[in-house]
Amino acid sequence: IDAHLNHLKNYNVPIVVCINKFNDDSLDDINYIKDYVKSRGYVCEVSDAYSKGGEGAIDLAKAVIKSCEEVDHFKPLVDKSDSIKNKINKLNKLVYNSEMTEYSEVAEEKLKLIDKLGLSHLPICVAKTQYSISDDPKLLGYPKDNVLHVRDLIINRGAGFITVLSGKIYTMPGLPKK
């Protein structure tokens, strides 16, 4: 949870943490998480919508409404005018907790192409493993000083963004209808 809270605080907006309660969750575990989040200075509510429907999410809804009434000073993590490489490096530092980024030869060539086509203003989406804050599925928890391996970039010109492929991640192929 620290990784997510540290990431979100960079945006300078109110944060509400939701614990999705399930029937087999222990009260001790829920209270531990809730107390930990509150000790970090964040609002934390439990949603029991899984078993109680909308009634189980009323406290969460109230907390979200209250946070929306606060003045926020949203700031994006990257500037639109940053180069794609600078955007990747900033995300790596602020989101993935690392200062080191390695680019494959293919990625370096794509970065040059993106600049040549005048597409550096596009936002980026990093495709990486869901198992870790890094691009290595074996680095669990909140690893520090890991290396983000950028192996390729995909220009999604129609959709208006660049996909950054990191580690050994593959995008989902189109599946047959049958």
Region locations from a protein language model:
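P-loop NTP-binding site
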Residues: 1-178
